[in-house]
């Protein structure tokens, strides 16, 4: 769809006081319409409500399992998402006594500079930015995966897209670049599911701890209704929140020493000691082959009785590594099957033993607690 150009056209004209750097606006399909076109099935509804309750129970120490958010760094093809879900489902069922498995299914990607921003923003991978198409593709994918029996996790990047997808999510994350943002803290206070805040890109945890405290309170903010109208939104606050350790510029922060320090920081702020650890990003030193090492360390801490670790994140795809995806027409046809086009991921073959080890660690912790 071509942009609807403003009177100022494609030139910068200081005589115009507003929208000088905006080329134009295209209509956005209302969330209410998309939800009606692509509704939630009864099977999906049960998967979503049950998994939300399970995650809440784990956070509140009413369930001694851990949450495992595992899946591709980003989704560029809905078919690959379903193919991955078909690998994940049997393993999730097998380990459900120890792990609450949620599939990572990220639709939008924050970029350090520029680059492909995700399935919603550019579903064709050609710079056409067919956002209305991307919204429908993404919602159908979410419906398909949840109907298959897999709960979903995604990152919250703006306060409009959740109106299209939040009813299908069981878990949300606020990324390292946006944890300090007031807008994202307000958004998290409105979401109907648990939300984790990552530590800052510099590795410090203070911004995430502040975010958890702020999100627990009600907020009044600018928002958009499902009909697409600008609105003043009032939130209840969200106490189902926790910190996600992802490492940073100063190095990894997944080891027992860092976890103990963060636990003390949370307690000092009068917050529950709930810690999820990301095996990727700064904790893997941006090398996907380090993720199993990180996971092994986390499992060992759990075996040793650490109850503050409530979850783990793993960037995993069907096949390992990553590939470049130049944004141009026809690029989709040239991509390798099941390989990430954003961050490098471990393969499914590498992922399955990581899940087994984490499950065994939870069972060992459970047995030790019973013995004591």
Swiss-Prot record:
Alphabetical GO CC annotations of the entry are:
cytoplasm; cytosol; mitochondrion; nucleus
| Top EC group | transferase
KW Transcription regulation (keyword) present: no
**Keyword Ubl conjugation among record annotations:** no
What family does the database annotate?
Answer: Belongs to the class-I DAHP synthase family.
Which gene name belongs to this protein?
aro4
> Which coarse location class applies to the principal site listed for this UniProt protein?
cytoplasm
Metabolic or biological pathway: Metabolic intermediate biosynthesis; chorismate biosynthesis; chorismate from D-erythrose 4-phosphate and phosphoenolpyruvate: step 1/7
Q: By what name is this protein known?
A: Phospho-2-dehydro-3-deoxyheptonate aldolase, tyrosine-inhibited
Q: What does this protein do?
A: Stereospecific condensation of phosphoenolpyruvate (PEP) and D-erythrose-4-phosphate (E4P) giving rise to 3-deoxy-D-arabino-heptulosonate-7-phosphate (DAHP).
Its GO biological process annotations read: amino acid biosynthetic process; aromatic amino acid family biosynthetic process; chorismate biosynthetic process
According to the record, the segments passing through the membrane are none
Lineage of producing organism: Eukaryota, Fungi, Dikarya, Ascomycota, Taphrinomycotina
Q: Which Gene3D superfamilies match?
A: Aldolase class I
- Substrates-to-products reaction catalysed: D-erythrose 4-phosphate + phosphoenolpyruvate + H2O = 7-phospho-2-dehydro-3-deoxy-D-arabino-heptonate + phosphate
**Keywords, ordered alphabetically:** Amino-acid biosynthesis, Aromatic amino acid biosynthesis, Cytoplasm, Nucleus, Stress response, Transferase
Annotated Gene Ontology MF terms?
A: 3-deoxy-7-phosphoheptulonate synthase activity
Looking at the Swiss-Prot or TrEMBL record, what is one Pfam family this protein matches?
Answer: DAHP_synth_1
Entry EC number(s)? 2.5.1.54
Cited NCBIfam families: aroFGH, PRK12755.1
State its location(s). Cytoplasm; Nucleus
